[in-house]
Swiss-Prot record:
Residues that coordinate or bind substrate: 69, 119, 165, 172, 196, 248, 266
Record-linked Pfam families: Glutaminase (PF04960)
UniProt keyword annotations, A-Z: Hydrolase
Protein name (database record): Glutaminase
Organism: Rhizorhabdus wittichii (strain DSM 6014 / CCUG 31198 / JCM 15750 / NBRC 105917 / EY 4224 / RW1)
Higher taxonomy: Bacteria, Pseudomonadati, Pseudomonadota, Alphaproteobacteria, Sphingomonadales
Amino acid sequence: MPVTVAPDLQAIVDRIAAEMAGREERGKVADYIPGLARVDPKHFGIAVATHDGRMFAAGDADMAFSIQSVSKVFALTIALGKVGDALWKRVGREPSGNAFNSIVQLEAEQGIPRNPFINAGAIVVSDVVLAGHAPKEAIGEILRFVRDLAGDDGIVVDDEVAQGEADTGFRNAALANYMRSFGNILHPVDQVLGVYFHQCALAMSCRQLARAGRFLMHEGQHPDTGFNIVSPMRARRINALMMLCGHYDGSGEFAFRVGIPGKSGVGGGILCVVPGIASIAVWSPGLNERGNSTLGSLALERLAAATGWSVFNQREPG
Protein backbone atom coordinates (compact mmCIF):
# COMPACT_ATOMS: atom_id res chain seq x y z
CA MET A 1 0.00 0.00 0.00
CA PRO A 2 1.56 3.34 -1.03
CA VAL A 3 2.45 5.68 1.84
CA THR A 4 0.17 8.65 1.24
CA VAL A 5 -1.59 11.14 3.49
CA ALA A 6 -4.53 12.96 1.93
CA PRO A 7 -3.64 16.66 1.56
CA ASP A 8 -7.04 17.66 2.96
CA LEU A 9 -6.96 15.30 5.94
CA GLN A 10 -7.92 17.96 8.50
CA ALA A 11 -10.94 18.89 6.40
CA ILE A 12 -11.90 15.20 6.18
CA VAL A 13 -11.59 14.77 9.95
CA ASP A 14 -13.61 17.95 10.60
CA ARG A 15 -16.32 16.80 8.20
CA ILE A 16 -16.57 13.40 9.89
CA ALA A 17 -16.82 14.99 13.35
CA ALA A 18 -19.58 17.32 12.13
CA GLU A 19 -21.52 14.40 10.66
CA MET A 20 -21.21 12.36 13.86
CA ALA A 21 -22.40 15.35 15.94
CA GLY A 22 -25.64 15.37 13.94
CA ARG A 23 -26.35 11.66 14.26
CA GLU A 24 -29.35 10.61 16.32
CA GLU A 25 -28.59 6.88 16.63
CA ARG A 26 -25.59 6.60 18.94
CA GLY A 27 -26.01 3.19 20.54
CA LYS A 28 -26.09 2.44 24.26
CA VAL A 29 -23.34 3.08 26.81
CA ALA A 30 -21.96 0.11 28.75
CA ASP A 31 -24.11 0.21 31.88
CA TYR A 32 -22.67 -2.83 33.68
CA ILE A 33 -19.56 -0.89 34.78
CA PRO A 34 -20.65 1.99 37.06
CA GLY A 35 -17.98 4.42 35.88
CA LEU A 36 -19.01 3.95 32.24
CA ALA A 37 -22.76 4.08 32.77
CA ARG A 38 -22.62 7.81 33.58
CA VAL A 39 -20.76 8.89 30.42
CA ASP A 40 -22.70 11.18 28.07
CA PRO A 41 -23.30 9.30 24.77
CA LYS A 42 -23.19 12.59 22.85
CA HIS A 43 -19.39 12.72 23.01
CA PHE A 44 -17.36 12.08 19.87
CA GLY A 45 -13.65 12.52 19.27
CA ILE A 46 -11.19 11.57 16.55
CA ALA A 47 -7.40 11.91 16.22
CA VAL A 48 -5.12 10.79 13.40
CA ALA A 49 -1.34 10.63 13.91
CA THR A 50 0.43 10.32 10.56
CA HIS A 51 3.76 8.75 9.65
CA ASP A 52 5.34 12.16 9.06
CA GLY A 53 4.70 13.29 12.65
CA ARG A 54 1.55 15.36 12.14
CA MET A 55 -1.67 15.13 14.15
CA PHE A 56 -5.17 15.81 12.85
CA ALA A 57 -7.96 15.96 15.42
CA ALA A 58 -11.56 17.05 15.85
CA GLY A 59 -14.43 16.86 18.31
CA ASP A 60 -13.69 15.71 21.85
CA ALA A 61 -10.20 14.55 20.90
CA ASP A 62 -8.65 15.81 24.16
CA MET A 63 -11.22 14.36 26.56
CA ALA A 64 -10.01 11.33 28.52
CA PHE A 65 -12.11 8.16 28.46
CA SER A 66 -11.74 4.60 29.70
CA ILE A 67 -9.93 2.68 26.96
CA GLN A 68 -11.02 -0.72 28.34
CA SER A 69 -10.18 -3.53 25.87
CA VAL A 70 -8.05 -1.27 23.68
CA SER A 71 -5.48 -1.74 26.46
CA LYS A 72 -5.19 -5.39 25.45
CA VAL A 73 -2.99 -4.34 22.52
CA PHE A 74 -0.43 -2.82 24.88
CA ALA A 75 -0.57 -5.67 27.41
CA LEU A 76 -0.10 -8.18 24.58
CA THR A 77 2.96 -6.28 23.37
CA ILE A 78 4.49 -6.43 26.87
CA ALA A 79 3.68 -10.14 27.27
CA LEU A 80 5.26 -11.01 23.91
CA GLY A 81 8.36 -9.10 24.99
CA LYS A 82 8.56 -11.27 28.11
CA VAL A 83 7.87 -14.77 26.77
CA GLY A 84 7.86 -14.44 22.98
CA ASP A 85 6.06 -17.06 20.94
CA ALA A 86 5.71 -19.29 24.01
CA LEU A 87 2.60 -17.20 24.70
CA TRP A 88 0.82 -19.00 21.86
CA LYS A 89 0.90 -22.25 23.81
CA ARG A 90 -1.54 -20.62 26.24
CA VAL A 91 -3.59 -18.37 23.94
CA GLY A 92 -4.84 -19.00 20.40
CA ARG A 93 -4.86 -16.69 17.40
CA GLU A 94 -8.28 -17.40 15.92
CA PRO A 95 -11.47 -15.31 15.90
CA SER A 96 -13.90 -16.49 18.53
CA GLY A 97 -17.32 -15.91 16.97
CA ASN A 98 -18.75 -15.65 20.48
CA ALA A 99 -19.28 -12.75 22.88
CA PHE A 100 -16.10 -11.26 24.38
CA ASN A 101 -16.90 -12.65 27.84
CA SER A 102 -18.13 -16.09 26.74
CA ILE A 103 -17.13 -19.16 28.74
CA VAL A 104 -18.51 -21.69 26.23
CA GLN A 105 -15.39 -22.33 24.15
CA LEU A 106 -13.06 -22.67 27.13
CA GLU A 107 -14.55 -26.00 28.13
CA ALA A 108 -14.33 -27.46 24.63
CA GLU A 109 -10.79 -26.15 24.13
CA GLN A 110 -9.30 -27.20 27.47
CA GLY A 111 -8.91 -23.75 28.98
CA ILE A 112 -7.03 -22.23 26.01
CA PRO A 113 -8.72 -18.96 24.95
CA ARG A 114 -9.25 -18.40 21.24
CA ASN A 115 -7.27 -15.15 21.06
CA PRO A 116 -5.66 -12.50 23.31
CA PHE A 117 -8.38 -9.91 22.70
CA ILE A 118 -11.37 -11.71 24.19
CA ASN A 119 -11.56 -11.40 27.97
CA ALA A 120 -10.29 -14.91 28.72
CA GLY A 121 -7.26 -14.41 26.48
CA ALA A 122 -6.50 -11.01 27.94
CA ILE A 123 -6.65 -12.46 31.45
CA VAL A 124 -3.99 -15.01 30.45
CA VAL A 125 -1.92 -12.13 29.07
CA SER A 126 -2.29 -10.34 32.43
CA ASP A 127 -1.05 -13.52 34.13
CA VAL A 128 2.07 -13.39 31.94
CA VAL A 129 2.65 -9.68 32.66
CA LEU A 130 2.29 -10.38 36.39
CA ALA A 131 5.14 -12.94 36.43
CA GLY A 132 7.94 -11.78 38.73
CA HIS A 133 5.96 -8.76 39.93
CA ALA A 134 3.66 -7.73 42.70
CA PRO A 135 0.32 -6.65 41.18
CA LYS A 136 1.06 -2.94 41.70
CA GLU A 137 4.40 -3.36 39.91
CA ALA A 138 2.72 -5.05 36.93
CA ILE A 139 0.12 -2.28 36.72
CA GLY A 140 2.93 0.27 36.92
CA GLU A 141 4.79 -1.46 34.09
CA ILE A 142 1.75 -1.23 31.81
CA LEU A 143 1.16 2.42 32.73
CA ARG A 144 4.81 3.38 32.13
CA PHE A 145 4.79 1.58 28.79
CA VAL A 146 1.71 3.41 27.54
CA ARG A 147 3.02 6.75 28.80
CA ASP A 148 6.29 6.16 26.95
CA LEU A 149 4.52 5.24 23.72
CA ALA A 150 2.33 8.34 23.88
CA GLY A 151 5.09 10.61 25.19
CA ASP A 152 2.71 11.78 27.89
CA ASP A 153 3.12 11.27 31.65
CA GLY A 154 -0.38 12.64 32.23
CA ILE A 155 -2.00 9.30 31.39
CA VAL A 156 -3.51 7.69 34.50
CA VAL A 157 -5.52 4.71 35.69
CA ASP A 158 -9.07 5.62 36.70
CA ASP A 159 -9.29 3.93 40.10
CA GLU A 160 -13.06 4.40 40.29
CA VAL A 161 -13.55 2.47 37.06
CA ALA A 162 -11.10 -0.23 38.18
CA GLN A 163 -12.97 -0.66 41.46
CA GLY A 164 -16.29 -0.77 39.64
CA GLU A 165 -15.00 -3.55 37.43
CA ALA A 166 -13.76 -5.49 40.44
CA ASP A 167 -17.14 -5.09 42.14
CA THR A 168 -19.09 -6.34 39.12
CA GLY A 169 -16.59 -8.61 37.32
CA PHE A 170 -18.16 -11.94 38.24
CA ARG A 171 -17.96 -13.33 34.69
CA ASN A 172 -14.27 -12.45 34.45
CA ALA A 173 -13.67 -14.14 37.81
CA ALA A 174 -15.43 -17.24 36.48
CA LEU A 175 -13.27 -17.21 33.34
CA ALA A 176 -10.07 -16.86 35.37
CA ASN A 177 -10.97 -19.61 37.83
CA TYR A 178 -12.04 -21.92 35.04
CA MET A 179 -8.72 -21.43 33.22
CA ARG A 180 -6.85 -21.94 36.49
CA SER A 181 -8.57 -25.32 36.81
CA PHE A 182 -6.89 -26.24 33.50
CA GLY A 183 -3.52 -24.92 34.71
CA ASN A 184 -3.58 -21.94 32.35
CA ILE A 185 -3.56 -19.29 35.11
CA LEU A 186 -0.41 -19.54 37.23
CA HIS A 187 -0.89 -16.76 39.78
CA PRO A 188 -3.65 -16.17 42.35
CA VAL A 189 -6.81 -15.23 40.50
CA ASP A 190 -7.45 -12.09 42.55
CA GLN A 191 -3.99 -10.76 41.69
CA VAL A 192 -4.37 -11.50 37.97
CA LEU A 193 -7.78 -9.85 37.88
CA GLY A 194 -6.43 -6.85 39.78
CA VAL A 195 -3.90 -6.28 37.01
CA TYR A 196 -6.52 -6.85 34.32
CA PHE A 197 -9.10 -4.48 35.80
CA HIS A 198 -6.56 -1.68 36.31
CA GLN A 199 -5.19 -2.14 32.80
CA CYS A 200 -8.69 -1.78 31.35
CA ALA A 201 -9.24 1.35 33.47
CA LEU A 202 -6.51 3.35 31.73
CA ALA A 203 -7.91 6.79 30.89
CA MET A 204 -6.67 8.36 27.66
CA SER A 205 -7.80 10.90 25.09
CA CYS A 206 -8.03 10.18 21.37
CA ARG A 207 -4.90 12.25 20.82
CA GLN A 208 -2.96 10.26 23.44
CA LEU A 209 -4.24 6.92 22.15
CA ALA A 210 -3.37 7.72 18.54
CA ARG A 211 0.16 8.61 19.63
CA ALA A 212 0.45 5.39 21.66
CA GLY A 213 -0.43 3.30 18.61
CA ARG A 214 2.19 4.83 16.32
CA PHE A 215 4.75 2.05 16.86
CA LEU A 216 2.42 -0.37 15.08
CA MET A 217 2.30 2.02 12.12
CA HIS A 218 6.13 2.20 12.12
CA GLU A 219 6.83 -1.58 11.99
CA GLY A 220 7.41 -1.72 15.74
CA GLN A 221 9.69 1.31 16.07
CA HIS A 222 9.02 4.17 18.50
CA PRO A 223 8.73 7.18 16.16
CA ASP A 224 10.16 9.64 18.71
CA THR A 225 13.17 7.67 19.96
CA GLY A 226 13.87 5.19 17.16
CA PHE A 227 13.83 2.37 19.74
CA ASN A 228 12.48 -0.94 18.48
CA ILE A 229 9.48 -1.71 20.70
CA VAL A 230 8.93 -4.95 18.76
CA SER A 231 10.38 -6.41 15.58
CA PRO A 232 8.74 -5.55 12.24
CA MET A 233 7.41 -9.11 11.99
CA ARG A 234 5.85 -8.95 15.46
CA ALA A 235 4.27 -5.57 14.70
CA ARG A 236 2.72 -7.05 11.56
CA ARG A 237 1.41 -10.00 13.53
CA ILE A 238 -0.13 -7.80 16.23
CA ASN A 239 -1.82 -5.83 13.45
CA ALA A 240 -3.04 -9.10 11.93
CA LEU A 241 -4.59 -10.13 15.25
CA MET A 242 -6.28 -6.74 15.51
CA MET A 243 -7.71 -7.25 12.03
CA LEU A 244 -9.00 -10.75 12.77
CA CYS A 245 -10.06 -10.46 16.40
CA GLY A 246 -10.10 -6.80 17.41
CA HIS A 247 -13.84 -6.18 17.47
CA TYR A 248 -15.22 -9.17 19.36
CA ASP A 249 -17.74 -11.06 17.23
CA GLY A 250 -18.10 -8.01 14.96
CA SER A 251 -14.54 -8.28 13.61
CA GLY A 252 -15.57 -9.57 10.21
CA GLU A 253 -18.08 -6.77 9.72
CA PHE A 254 -15.46 -4.18 10.69
CA ALA A 255 -12.93 -5.66 8.25
CA PHE A 256 -15.59 -5.63 5.53
CA ARG A 257 -16.63 -2.02 6.11
CA VAL A 258 -13.35 -0.37 7.19
CA GLY A 259 -10.53 -2.66 6.05
CA ILE A 260 -7.79 -1.72 8.52
CA PRO A 261 -6.58 -3.34 11.77
CA GLY A 262 -8.32 -2.07 14.88
CA LYS A 263 -9.09 -2.80 18.52
CA SER A 264 -12.24 -1.61 20.22
CA GLY A 265 -13.27 -1.27 23.86
CA VAL A 266 -16.60 -1.02 25.66
CA GLY A 267 -15.65 2.48 26.79
CA GLY A 268 -16.40 3.48 23.19
CA GLY A 269 -12.81 3.84 22.00
CA ILE A 270 -11.26 2.26 18.91
CA LEU A 271 -7.56 2.28 18.00
CA CYS A 272 -6.80 1.62 14.32
CA VAL A 273 -3.53 1.26 12.44
CA VAL A 274 -2.88 1.95 8.77
CA PRO A 275 0.59 0.37 8.38
CA GLY A 276 3.13 2.90 7.17
CA ILE A 277 0.58 5.71 7.14
CA ALA A 278 -1.38 6.46 10.31
CA SER A 279 -2.47 5.58 13.83
CA ILE A 280 -6.09 6.54 14.44
CA ALA A 281 -8.16 6.81 17.61
CA VAL A 282 -11.87 7.48 17.76
CA TRP A 283 -14.21 7.65 20.74
CA SER A 284 -17.96 7.70 21.13
CA PRO A 285 -19.35 5.88 24.17
CA GLY A 286 -22.56 4.52 22.65
CA LEU A 287 -22.14 0.87 21.64
CA ASN A 288 -23.79 -1.37 19.05
CA GLU A 289 -25.09 -4.87 19.78
CA ARG A 290 -21.57 -6.31 19.41
CA GLY A 291 -20.09 -3.99 22.04
CA ASN A 292 -18.29 -1.72 19.57
CA SER A 293 -18.69 2.06 19.31
CA THR A 294 -21.60 2.85 16.97
CA LEU A 295 -20.36 6.24 15.81
CA GLY A 296 -16.70 5.29 16.12
CA SER A 297 -17.16 2.42 13.68
CA LEU A 298 -19.10 4.64 11.27
CA ALA A 299 -16.50 7.41 11.50
CA LEU A 300 -13.72 4.97 10.64
CA GLU A 301 -15.73 3.70 7.69
CA ARG A 302 -16.11 7.29 6.49
CA LEU A 303 -12.39 7.98 7.01
CA ALA A 304 -11.31 4.87 5.10
CA ALA A 305 -13.64 5.75 2.22
CA ALA A 306 -12.44 9.36 2.05
CA THR A 307 -8.71 8.54 2.17
CA GLY A 308 -8.58 5.19 0.37
CA TRP A 309 -6.79 3.69 3.38
CA SER A 310 -7.19 -0.09 3.48
CA VAL A 311 -4.86 -3.05 3.83
CA PHE A 312 -6.70 -4.46 0.80
CA ASN A 313 -6.07 -1.43 -1.40
CA GLN A 314 -3.24 -1.56 -3.93
CA ARG A 315 -4.17 1.62 -5.79
CA GLU A 316 -2.86 5.06 -4.89
CA PRO A 317 -5.08 6.41 -2.08
CA GLY A 318 -6.87 9.66 -2.76
